[in-house]
Amino acid sequence: MPQAALDKYAGWEPRYCREHSPQRARALDKPNTPAQSVAKSRGSVGRGRSLREANLTTNEVLDKFTDGPETGVFTDGGSAPNPGPGGWGVVWVKDGEIQAERYGHDPDTTNNRMELMALTEAFKILPEDAEVEVFSDSRLCVQTITEWAPGWERRGWKKKSGPIKNLELVQQLLRLYRAHPRCTLKWTAAHSGTRWNEYADSLSTAWMRDKK
């Protein structure tokens, strides 16, 4: 603390700065918790780690992770930076066996567009009579399709707060979602160790490894 500040506020005793707060100290004391995880970045790409830090191959994912459902369609997408180049990935598994997987890349995109693209491709690979859970780690995208989009549609694809972002993707995804009435769209936490969500994340970052 500068002496000038202490002279200006006589009698005041400094407690601690944000850098040395008890909350930060507790976080740093946790085993295997890197300092950078204290302040997590927003968006599906970097919940707790950046896209580049999470850039595992699919084989590395299978070796490292074992938790989570063994049946379902898992999706992920993101860009680095946001906006910027990005990718999406989808894997459909049944009893731990891969039924299908897809991934793609866009040189100029956003996190949300890639998340929507991943979900769109997920429903494209499923037959219309499929009965399976489809997972996304984007709560925004899940709520958009399951809660908000039907209301926007009734109002002529308008919402009170302004234009609907990524409207063409939202409309396409809503049509595909409705064409699969026995499928359930669910949110799952990002980078929580769920094996097949991590696998979808790896597919979504394949474009980065392909550049090397």
Set out the residue ranges of the language-model regions.
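Beta-lactamase-like hydrolase cores
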Residues: 60, 64-87
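Short linker/helix segments within small regulatory modules
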Residues: 2-16
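Short metal-binding segments enriched for Cys and/or His
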Residues: 12-36
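A short, polar/acidic, helix/strand-boundary loop motif
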Residues: 97-114
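Charged, flexible boundary elements
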Residues: 40-63
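Short beta-strand scaffold segments in enzyme catalytic cores
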Residues: 88-92
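RNase H catalytic domain
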Residues: 71-72, 78-82, 97, 101, ...
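Cys/His-rich microdomains that often coordinate metals
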Residues: 1-5, 21-24
